[in-house]
Regions:
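Hydrophobic secondary-structure signal with a strong preference for alpha-helical segments in membranes
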Residues: 1-239, 466-560
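Membrane-embedded alpha-helical segments of integral membrane proteins
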Residues: 4-44, 397, 401, 406-458
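Alpha-helix C-terminal capping segments
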Residues: 21-24, 81, 106-108, 198-205, ...
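Hydrophobic alpha-helical transmembrane segments in multi-pass membrane proteins
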Residues: 29-30, 40-59, 228-381, 445-483
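Juxtamembrane/interfacial segments around transmembrane helices
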Residues: 56-64, 81-85, 103-106, 185, ...
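Alpha-helical transmembrane segments of multi-pass integral membrane proteins
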Residues: 341-439
Length: 560
């Protein structure tokens, strides 16, 4: 009832706050322009509504102070970071061992660091692989800033760490002592509990079954999953492992059903669901997609649905996970949720509803997919529909039961089923080929795409406008894929440069692809899962430029 009496739509308010966030933390002309445009639109529609002005002034003022505080604190932490520390406390469930390389998130004196350490022996590796305690590492620890973006569409590791409140990398040059932390907080307890569950799965279940169990139940995929991850990414269904609505709906739905069957009145459901949701969020890594789904589910208990639900969810996410809009997962998760809130296909038949939902989601999310990845797999719509049923109706319940019973008996007999499924997916990939390479739009092109889609939503019932707008959207995609310019680019590939040349006609020449020369051999325990320099530097650049084929390749280095 109070939502109906609210002087302003909460989703409109959330959009205004989101544009304010980007204005402060991204600070470019597009962010400032979006904020100014939304503010003018609001004032135009609510100028005479004093209640709306007061509400926006109050909420906007609070978030303005909040964002400025976060920005100032980040600046202080970056400037005041020391050059060296002598001990760091590791967050238990962030420990990752890849061959001889140990990585984790650590904390020391109010600062958070990305910690790296080169393991000295197989015994040391086994210890860090199997421990579930909060460890304090003491020794000589050098701090350094992370590497920023080196190429167009290259991964900006510095910005990625900054979105998690991390401004320095900590390299342990000499490890003197490893001791368990004595006094642990409630938050550290959940980190240890999650780590204990992950270690239990990794040591008791075979591969690849254990990867599906850690991924679907706890939102964790280790380096050993890289090969399968490339397969799922190529097919466009890697998002099935990103915990969100499917998993939250399963666990929260069954927990709610159990409470009702036990006779708990509906009026008391929220009191029990709230702490359960908090624990579930912590056990799954406290990610943006999980928090978004949990908040929306809890708000639905009060009858808050559609855009009001989405608006309040966005405002709460800014409090629980301030920089969620700087992460790919946060943006894509909220974009999918917004599209589902915006359209209503309930009156359609199940088949027609499924087709329309897939088409709307694919078209609405396409600008974001091209902006972040530069690729799109059309068959992913069909595969998502197929495998979401398999994951939701079979894998999730079965893996949950097997994990719960694993303290008594280990069910590894169905591991061949996972091997067969991956073989089947490999066959599908060989049949359908690689994703379409569409290129990455500039911010200007991206804004034009969003504007066209907004107008398409408004004028959908007018056929002439609809066809015209769809043609404009298609032309924008062609513009991104085939820029009308000649190009000569030097790409930093880690060891030297690669030179890329392209003419307006689309003819391409690539000189060198980068590489890494390794000297000597390593013991088996030291071998790590690695990706080539080209996969991290050159290939993302070519995909961002819409290049799907190289006409001429010239190699000048001797290590071919």
């Amino acid at each position: 009832m109070w939502l109906k009496k609210a002087p302003i739509n909460f989703f409109s308010l959330a959009l205004l706050i989101a544009s304010l966030y980007f204005t402060i933390f991204v600070t470019n002309v597009y962010a400032m322009g979006a904020f100014a445009f939304l503010l003018v639109c609001f004032l135009k529609h609510h100028w005479k509504n004093k209640a709306a002005l007061k509400l926006v002034g109050l909420v906007g003022g609070f978030f303005l102070i909040y964002f400025l505080f976060l920005h100032h604190r980040a600046s202080i932490q970056d400037k005041q970071a020391p050059a060296e520390i002598n001990q760091v406390s590791l967050v238990a469930d962030t420990l990752s061992v890849n061959g001889e390389q140990l990585s984790a998130i650590g904390k020391a004196k109010g600062q958070t660091y990305q910690v790296f350490y080169r393991l000295k022996s197989e015994k040391e590796q086994h210890f860090f692989k199997t421990t579930s305690q909060t460890l304090v590492l003491k020794g000589k620890i050098k701090l350094s800033p992370a590497t920023g973006q080196r190429n167009f569409q290259g991964f900006n590791y510095k910005s990625y760490l900054a979105s998690q409140g991390i401004y320095r990398m900590a390299q342990i040059e000499r490890l003197d002592h490893v001791v368990p932390q004595k006094n642990t907080s409630p938050l550290a307890f959940f980190h240890q509990l999650r780590r204990r569950a992950l270690v239990h799965i990794q040591t008791h279940f075979p591969n690849p079954m254990r990867h599906y169990m850690t991924g679907l139940l706890f939102g964790y995929l280790d380096k050993e999953f890289d090969e399968q991850s490339q397969l799922y990414t190529s097919l466009g269904i890697i998002h099935l492992f990103a915990l969100s609505g499917m998993q939250v709906g399963f666990f929260l739905g069954w927990f709610r059903y159990g409470l009702l069957r036990l006779g708990l009145p509906k009026d008391y459901l929220f009191i029990i669901l709230l702490p359960f949701s908090l624990c579930y969020g912590l056990m799954t890594g406290w990610t943006a997609s999980v928090l978004r789904s949990l908040i929306q589910s809890l708000l639905a208990e009060f009858g808050i649905k559609k855009l009001d639900n989405m608006g309040i969810t966005l405002l709460l996410l800014f409090l629980f996970l301030p920089h969620f809009l700087l992460t790919v997962g946060g943006v894509l998760s909220c974009s999918y949720a917004f599209l589902l809130c915006l359209f209503d296909f309930e009156e359609m038949s199940s088949l027609k509803k499924s087709i329309c939902t897939s088409l709307v989601l694919s078209l609405g999310i396409l600008p974001f997919l091209t902006y972040y990845y530069g690729t799109f797999q059309p068959v992913s719509l069909i595969l998502t529909a197929m495998f979401s049923i398999v994951f939701d109706s079979f894998l999730l319940p079965v893996l949950t039961v097997f994990f719960v019973l694993s303290g008594l008996v280990i069910f590894s007999q169905i591991n061949p089923l996972f091997e067969w499924m991956e073989t089947f997916l490999t066959w599908i990939q060989s049949w359908i080929g690689q994703p379409l390479i569409l290129g990455k739009p500039s911010l200007f092109q991206f804004d034009l795409m969003i504007a066209v889609l907004v107008m398409l939503f408004d004028f959908w019932k007018k056929p002439q406008f609809r066809i015209c707008l769809l043609m404009i959207f298609g032309l924008l995609m062609v513009w991104v894929k085939h820029p009308l310019t000649n190009e000569v680019t030097m790409v930093d590939v880690g060891q030297g440069d690669s030179i890329f040349l392209r003419s307006m006609k689309g003819d391409t020449i690539l000189i060198d692809v980068g590489g890494k020369v390794t000297f000597g051999s390593k013991e088996k325990w030291q071998e790590a899962s690695q990706t080539s320099n080209a996969e991290k530097t050159l290939i993302p650049y070519l995909q961002a430029r819409g290049v799907s084929q190289i006409d001429h390749l010239v190699l000048t280095h001797t290590e071919v």
